[in-house]
Structures are given as C-alpha cells and as structure tokens.
C-alpha cells in the first residue's frame, strides 16, 4: 500500500500531512484524484517543522512530468561493470594502506558547516553543498575528509595513543567546474599520520602512493610528484615585505599558477596590495625548479630548505627518488597546510593533479584540540581512472561466478535450490536459474557470467541423489552425489 504526503501551504504553525492511501492497487484501476494546483512537498529542500526553509512550489503539471533518468550533473551511477572497477580500485587502496600498517576509519558524509569553513580556504567554502536542516543547524556535505579526521581525533582524546596511522575511503562533494577527471562528487582515499613531527612521515606517505602506482602498472615515466614547502613561500613573503595576514590569500592565488594565465595571477596578487615589483620577484622565485637554486636565493639556513633536503634524502632510501622533483610553485590551495606539500601529476600534462597532500601541524588546535603534528594526502578516484584509460591499463573485470545451477524440469526447481544452498554453504558462488529455461539459454548465460562449471539437476540423477556437472573450460562432464559435490 503506497501513500503520498501532501502538505498544504500553511494550515497552522506546524505541518499536518494529508495521507492519500490506496493510490495504487493491483486488483483495480487507479483511482482518479485531483491534485491542488500549488503544493508544498515536505521532503523537498529540507523543509520541515521548523519552517527554516521554504520548499519549492509544485504544480499539477510538475507532478505528472516524466522523471529525468540521468543522475544530477556531476554525479555518477555505478552499474555492475563500473562497480567492479570501483571495487578493484578500492581494494588496492585498502591493501596498500594495510601494507603500511594503517587502520581504516570513516566519518559522516554530513557534517556541521563550521567544520569546513573555519580552516579550509576560500575555494572550498565557495564549493560547499551546505544548507540549514530542520533543526535550524547549518550542515554541509563533506568536500574532503581531513577536517573530519581532526574532529574525530579530538573527540577520542587521550583514549588513542600516538602516533595514529589512519586511512579512509569516502565520498566527497564539491560544487566546482567540471573538467576531465573532475566531478562534483568523487571518492577519495586518504592516509594520515598524527603525532610525528619528522619529515619521515611525509616520506612514508609518498612511498605509499608510489607503491599503489606500481601495483596498478603506473611508472615514474607516467607520473611524478612536485614537492615544495609552505615555509618557502612564508620566507619569500617576509623577504619582500608582504604582511603575514596575506599569506593564506596568496597561497590560494599561487595554487592557480598552472590553471589560469600568468597575467591573471599578477592581477589577483595585485588586488591583495602587493607591489608590482614584489609580485615580479615572487613569481620569478616560484618558477625555480631546483632546490640548489632556491637555496642560493633564500639561503640555506631556513627550516624549509632543511626539511626538503631531508625529504629528498629519504626518497632515495625509500627507493622513489626518480618519482619526485622540486617545484617552488606548489603550495596547495587548502589553508591548513603548514610545511611540506606535494602533488602527484601526469607527466604528459593532460590531467589535473592526481593526488596531493602535506603537513598540517596546526589544524587540530584550530578546532580546539591539542597542537599535534600531522600530515596526510587525498587521492581521488575519478582522475586515476582517466589516467588508466589514457595508458590502456584498465583491467578487464567481467562478472565471475563459480557455478550455474539449473533444473532440467520445472518440477525440480526446489531440488535445484537445495543444490545451490549446499554449494553456497561451502563458500562457492552460485547463479541459480530461477525459471525453466532451455539449455541453449543456460549456456549463453554461463558464458556471460564467466561461470566455471554448470550443475544440472535432472530427474533420473536426482532420484539417485546425484547431479550432473559440466566443467565449461574443458568440456568434461560427470555425475556426482550431492554430498560429494565440492
């Protein structure tokens, strides 16, 4: 029995839903009923008892419109063939994370809005899917996972011992301009280390990504990592007399260097109040691709240079030195980064950043927690799939079923169910043919699902407690007792 809730425009201070029952009946034609010209749907846009959000008006014409079968722009369906690829990718994420000793966590998709706007940066704030819920609370769909991680670490307090090595794979939402490999929803793999101040943490994180790339067939000639430090930009701004309070804004602008024309970068930097001379010098230094050249410009005594030298030394020890390069322009757009930052990039330049991360030592204290050192990375699913397509490295992942069980007589459907249950109890996958079908159809289905063997339940064999088994790869066929069927 179905019911539709329709709410009148405002009968009182609280909703009084009108219930229309028995709209659909299998034994009689649908009843005719009239729909008011103007309705308010209680479920739409979060409208509820608080009255905090006014729901859109729905007309009778709207009610009868054909539903758009496509998902909302920027989102995806995952039919079986795409789900197999997603599971394959996620399994690699999980296996690599566990290989490095990390534990899996997860967080709510819906969080308080303040969690993301406090320290995320202007770009993230502009891209939030946020709204007011029925309790007049500002909430948002998570655009990333790191703030949720910080919240959970603070919540757990002293019940967890440091260092923490956690990973997560979660769906994230950003209302951004879509490009190849960039959607408004995506799944993101994060690995984070809480409680380690040394550069060894960043070195291990990059090592884990390299391990992942190698597992799926990506080489150092396909992708690389651009590495720098936020402290480099801090020292440069200090050298050129740029006020410290402009640092966050400048980072957001510099992060666009490879995305918009350089004249636009200069114009945006000019709007911050930085002099033309300082802008020219700053951009000249940020074009440096050699750590030695940077050291000549800002001196070798700075903390940024020491950290970066150590990272490159550790890269040799971990065995991925050919994967990384210095690039002073890498700053990352998120406001909470404090030290080393890195981005994975496509060496052919056809895709945007594949992954990115860095150190965020002060993020937890921003939310009221202790000032723990921390670093991590985020790795989206959409870009890597595009890269695998580009390199012709997508795996062939057909459906795989060990057994197809089929009754040769409609009166033996119950017997076929018994056989299927016996095999499933032994941990084997079974596709049970639920209708009476000709053998030609069954063989076609077996080929489609890549079945290993066909188990046929015939009247004569079943009376003897046996079934016929056909091994599809070799054509071998034999009869076996149900109790001996493995």
Swiss-Prot record:
Keyword Transit peptide tagged: yes
InterPro entries: aa-tRNA-synth_II, aa-tRNA-synth_II/BPL/LPL, Anticodon-bd, Anticodon-bd_dom_sf, His-tRNA-ligase, HisRS-like_core, HisRS/HisZ
GO cellular component: chloroplast; mitochondrion
Pfam families: HGTP_anticodon, tRNA-synt_His
UniProt-annotated location(s): Plastid, Chloroplast; Mitochondrion
SUPFAM superfamilies from the UniProt entry: Class II aaRS ABD-related, Class II aaRS and biotin synthetases
Reaction catalyzed: tRNA(His) + L-histidine + ATP = L-histidyl-tRNA(His) + AMP + diphosphate + H(+)
UniProt cross-references to PROSITE patterns, sorted A to Z: AA_TRNA_LIGASE_II
Enzyme class: ligase
GO terms of molecular function: ATP binding; histidine-tRNA ligase activity
Family classification: Belongs to the class-II aminoacyl-tRNA synthetase family.
Record HAMAP family: His_tRNA_synth
Name by which UniProt lists this protein: Histidine--tRNA ligase, chloroplastic/mitochondrial
Source organism (scientific name): Arabidopsis thaliana (Mouse-ear cress)
Lineage of source species: Eukaryota, Viridiplantae, Streptophyta, Embryophyta, Tracheophyta
């Amino acid at each position: 029995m179905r019911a539709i809730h329709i709410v009148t425009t405002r009968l009182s201070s609280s909703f009084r839903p009108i219930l229309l029952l028995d709209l659909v009946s299998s034994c009689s034609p649908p009843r005719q009923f009239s729909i008011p010209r103007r309705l308010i749907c209680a479920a739409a846009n979060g409208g509820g008892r608080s009255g905090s959000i006014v729901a859109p008006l729905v007309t009778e014409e709207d009610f009868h419109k054909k539903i758009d079968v496509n998902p909302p722009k920027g989102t995806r369906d995952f039919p079986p063939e795409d789900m197999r690829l997603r599971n394959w990718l996620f399994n690699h994420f999980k296996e690599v994370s566990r290989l490095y000793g990390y534990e899996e966590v997860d967080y709510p998709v819906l969080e308080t809005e303040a969690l993301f706007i406090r320290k995320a940066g202007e770009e993230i704030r502009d891209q939030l899917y946020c709204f007011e819920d029925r309790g007049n609370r500002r909430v948002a769909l998570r655009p990333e996972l790191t703030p949720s991680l910080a919240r959970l670490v603070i919540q757990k307090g002293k019940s967890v011992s440091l260092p923490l090595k956690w990973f997560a794979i979660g769906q994230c939402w950003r209302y951004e301009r879509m490009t190849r490999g960039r959607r408004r929803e995506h799944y993101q793999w994060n690995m984070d280390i809480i409680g380690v101040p040394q550069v060894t943490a960043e070195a291990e994180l990059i090592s884990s990504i390299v391990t992942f790339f190698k597992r799926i067939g990506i080489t150092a000639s396909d992708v690389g990592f651009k590495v720098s430090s936020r402290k480099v930009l801090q020292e440069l701004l200090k050298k050129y007399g740029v006020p410290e309070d402009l640092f966050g804004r400048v980072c957001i602008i510099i992060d666009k260097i490879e995305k918009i024309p350089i004249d636009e970068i200069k114009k945006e930097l000019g709007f911050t109040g930085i002099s033309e001379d300082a802008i020219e010098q700053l951009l000249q230094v940020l074009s440096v691709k050699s750590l030695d050249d940077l050291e000549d410009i800002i001196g070798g005594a700075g903390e940024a240079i020491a950290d970066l030298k150590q990272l490159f030394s550790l890269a040799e020890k971990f065995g991925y030195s050919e994967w990384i390069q210095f690039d002073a322009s890498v700053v990352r757009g998120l406001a909470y980064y404090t030290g080393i930052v890195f981005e994975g990039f496509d060496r052919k330049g056809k895709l945007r950043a594949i992954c990115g991360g860095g150190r965020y030592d002060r993020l937890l204290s921003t939310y009221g927690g202790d000032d723990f050192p921390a670093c991590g990375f985020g790795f989206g699913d959409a870009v890597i799939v595009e890269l695998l397509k580009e390199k012709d490295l997508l795996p062939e992942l057909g459906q795989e079923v060990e057994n197809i069980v089929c009754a040769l007589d409609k009166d033996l459907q119950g017997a076929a169910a018994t056989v299927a249950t016996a095999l499933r109890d032994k941990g084997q996958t079974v596709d049970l043919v639920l209708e009476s079908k000709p053998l030609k159809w069954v063989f076609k289905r077996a080929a489609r699902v890549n079945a290993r063997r066909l188990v046929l339940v015939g009247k004569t064999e079943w009376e003897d407690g046996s079934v016929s088994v056909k091994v599809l790869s070799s054509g071998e066929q034999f009869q076996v007792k149900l109790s001996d069927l493995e």
